[in-house]
Amino acid sequence: MIQALRGMNDMMDDEAKLYKKIIDVCEDTAKKYGYEYIEIPKLEETALFKRSVGESSDIVGKEMYQFTDKSGNDVCLRPEGTAGVVRAFIEHKMDRAGGVKKYFYHGSMFRYERPQKGRLREFHQFGIECFSEGSVYEDASVILMLSEILKKLDIEATLKINSLGDGDCMPKYREKLLKFLKENENELCSDCKRRISTNPIRVLDCKVEHCQKILQNAPLITENLNEICAGEFSKLQEILTANGVTFEVDPKLVRGLDYYTKTAFEFVSGEIGSQSAVGGGGRYDNLVAFLGGRPTFGVGFALGIERFMEILSSKESKQKRVGIYICALDKKYIDKIFKIGIDLRRNFKVEISYEAKNLQKHLKNADNKNAEIFLCMGENEAKNDELFMKNLIAKTNKNIKIAEILKEIR
């Protein structure tokens, strides 16, 4: 049987509805901020991403779906959306049209990574790009938009911000960082050693624990900003605070793409286990000119739809849990749990199991039936006129007296 490729999933039924719900919220919010829809190809020249994302980046170096087509063109499936929007902006001469242009997009992106929870080879993003607006107020507006989307979808996340400086302060900082890294090179991981010669700023993004300890003593970009960049970063914090947005300044936040300048930001959430980025972006004032257009300010963000779906589906499954599942570990106790179950049905939705199974099988059945409360009688419980009770939402459990069931469940 032919199946979907590894890391590329079908989206059906509830998943498809959830995807549409997220997109609808994102689109509605973007339109209220003055953004218009843009559709760009999923297949582009490889050179576009080598120049924009950076040849030394992991995306270009390891993760692109790159191939030569039948005409001999070096092409790849897009690994991210910003570069394609910038290419379209230049190709259609929007860089010469004057005025601020704002676009939003959504769709598939492709990276050849090891598939794991929250990370697929074909994944989906919603993104926005604003051109020709250099004010730090627009940086704040972009952050506020993503914050608003998160609130509308009831996703809890922490905002982290940083400034990467400009063409004046970044080279000076890069020199200081390079000196520090070379002094500690022998203690760094192999990826960090490679990045020292290709892109030393990306070393700050390393997640290896012993590298993080070494980097605690690294020079910070926020302490090496020139007067203009420092002033804008301070103003950004002032605007966010005035608009009720809490944040953390993270001087080691560099994002995974080479084109960012000045503002960089990321929203991270602990709702899917360890702290994971659910969306982020920043300013890229040099990218349009770097790709052949006229010098044009740029700022934007992208968010991971699958990450949002994982959080929301987990919440919805908890919200759907209702009622009681009652069972026995031995058939000689089924008469007892049957009577208890019938009594409970006067006040609750109750599923009674007539089969004697082991505890894990019963728990699996209760989970499949989306029960909120699991009740079970085994030998010890029967002797003590008790039931084992587990709350399948709170993940707590204890033994309760049969006479006190109603008090415990309410």
From Swiss-Prot:
Entry keywords, A to Z: Aminoacyl-tRNA synthetase, ATP-binding, Cytoplasm, Ligase, Nucleotide-binding, Protein biosynthesis
PROSITE patterns registered for this protein in UniProt: AA_TRNA_LIGASE_II
Disulfide-linked positions: none
GO biological process: histidyl-tRNA aminoacylation
The UniProt record lists the keyword Cytoplasm: yes
Chief localization: cytoplasm
EC number: 6.1.1.21
GO MF annotation terms: ATP binding; histidine-tRNA ligase activity
SUPFAM superfamilies: Class II aaRS ABD-related, Class II aaRS and biotin synthetases
Pfam families: HGTP_anticodon, tRNA-synt_His
Localization (cell): Cytoplasm
Domain of life: Bacteria
Substrates-to-products reaction catalysed: tRNA(His) + L-histidine + ATP = L-histidyl-tRNA(His) + AMP + diphosphate + H(+)
Alphabetized InterPro entries for the sequence: aa-tRNA-synth_II, aa-tRNA-synth_II/BPL/LPL, Anticodon-bd, Anticodon-bd_dom_sf, His-tRNA-ligase, HisRS-like_core, HisRS/HisZ
Enzyme superclass (EC): ligase
Any single Gene Ontology cellular-component annotation: cytoplasm
Subunit and interaction comment: Homodimer.
NCBIfam families in alphabetical order: hisS
Assigned protein family: Belongs to the class-II aminoacyl-tRNA synthetase family.
Protein name per UniProt: Histidine--tRNA ligase
Organism of origin: Campylobacter hominis (strain ATCC BAA-381 / DSM 21671 / CCUG 45161 / LMG 19568 / NCTC 13146 / CH001A)
